[in-house]
Amino acid sequence: MYLEHFGLREFPFSITPDTEFFFSTGVSQEALNTLLIAARTGEGFIKITGEVGTGKSMLCRKLMASLSSDFKVAYIPNPYLDPDSLFMELAAELEIEFDADTIAKHQALRAIKERLLMLHNSGKRIVVCLDEAQAMPIETLEALRLLSNLETEKRKLLQVIIFGQPELEDKLNHPSIRQLKQRIAFEYCLAPMGRDEIDYYIQHRLSVAGHQGTRMFTRPALWLLKLRTHCVPRLVNIVAHKALLSSYGRGRKNVTFWDVNAAVNDTASLRDFGTKFRLAFLLVMLLGSVLLLLIDKGYFR
């Protein structure tokens, strides 16, 4: 591939969340600070929402890496769980051993509470992180509320952080789980990066991957990258990776406007926007030509 060609140790624009590549934008740092403060308070639910590709999974991984050894984190990435399966997953994360085929739900819940009390007495705080929560069944979200009832006289035994797309809000408005929504103490909505942050984001990821040379992406390339990806981190990564492949295929050491354009045209989710952009550009050019012709003919004298 292009690693040796560009002097890189690893791929700089992988879409797999890797906290070594975490880039602190104004939005992501504020969200991380909110999560860290909320986790230390130990009260209620925490909700993080954002459109596809805005960095929810990366933020979740960064949070888990940032929590001190006082915390025990249970990470549940699979949202398609019924309540019983949720309890089994949580038990596995908490290192509780029992026969999942024979134990009843109330017994599993009791075993979880006993384990939580033991961890609490040893000075541990428990944080449960659930990804893609918008896909969770209503009854599983209600089971989460039941878990949040586990507490001592002074504090909750576990903190629940749910990450999801904006549709999660619609699900939380369901009448049967209105009590869960009332328990959300902190929430934050992730937005795409700012246009002025993309240049630094690209350079940051290249540097982490081992690049030590001069600017690799030309200014026209960055301009088109911002325009076509709307500064959504996942789309930026996908297009930047393909643009590097294009540059490598042409035997160059930098990424040009045309490399980004080729990358965009190779990305299905951006093709429709590209077609609309070209049609709009042609329409503007046509209207401009007609206007100049009318001026030349003296229609505006």
PLM-predicted stretches and their roles:
Residues 1-42, 289-301:
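A short, basic N-terminal segment
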Residues 11, 70, 84-100:
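Conserved NTP-binding/hydrolysis module of P-loop NTPases
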Residues 42-62, 79:
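Walker A/P-loop nucleotide-binding motif
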Residues 47-53, 104-107, 134-143, 148-176:
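Sensor-1/coupling segment of RecA-like P-loop NTPase cores
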Residues 47-49, 130, 226:
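Residues at the beta-strand->loop junction immediately N-terminal to the Walker
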Residues 82, 98-143, 152-156, 194-198, ...:
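Mid-core helix/loop region of P-loop NTP-binding domains shared across ATPases and GTPases
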Residues 93, 117-121, 127, 150-153, ...:
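Helix-loop-helix "sensor" segment of P-loop NTPases
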Residues 212-213, 218-301:
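C-terminal alpha-helical "lid" subdomain
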